[in-house]
Amino acid sequence: AVGCEVTVVPWDTPADKALAMGPDGIFFSNGPGDPESVPPVVDAVRACLGKLPVFGICLGNQVISMAAGAEIEKLPYGHHGGNEPVMNLLTGKVEITAQNHNYGLVFKTMGELVPELSGGVTEHFDDMREWSRRGIAPVVMTKELGRVRLTHVNLNDGTPEGIQFLDAPTFSVQYHPEAAPGPTDAHYLFTAFARLMDGDVDYLDIDISKDRLAGWVFDSEDASATAKTRA
């Protein structure tokens, strides 16, 4: 819907083969089960991070997090349905999302908080909803991949729902922005990926209501007119 040409490759395609295709960006999709069962995908993510724009959803979010050194846990109660409320910490807006997963990121295992970028907070919260209450999108320092920001939080159980790498062109969410049928609140994330591939530094700075008033329609030819052909 944003004018991208998509080439689908098998889940276990080595990173060098994918990169040899010369894509403008790589999308790590959703998939079934435990991310611990797909180490080749984690290796592929690790080889791609920092080299070109990367976007992941659901299982893609988990393997991107693992590639950055984070731990994944099995949730006490998995998220399954089309009405999970998620707050975008960058805009303060709440999105109704579709989700279908039993595992999730343990954000505190990504690294230590960067206080000057986390509202002065030095200790992690177990419940990510504390960040939504404070209106802060906290940032941690990973061991190898620089700074990572928490961008989205589940308002039902306080689990992390999205991250953004500040020193690499990479972001991911735990839910399904493409859900069909399902809510459309998160369709803007595909526009964000197109903007990232176009070199937009503020690619996630999208206020859906304001952009629509300005004439941007997120799944129309307006988007495709600004997007280059991508693999």
Regions found by a protein language model. Give the residues of each.
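Short FAD-binding loop at a beta-strand-to-alpha-helix junction that anchors the flavin cofactor
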Residues: 169-175
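Short helix-loop-beta junction
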Residues: 1-8
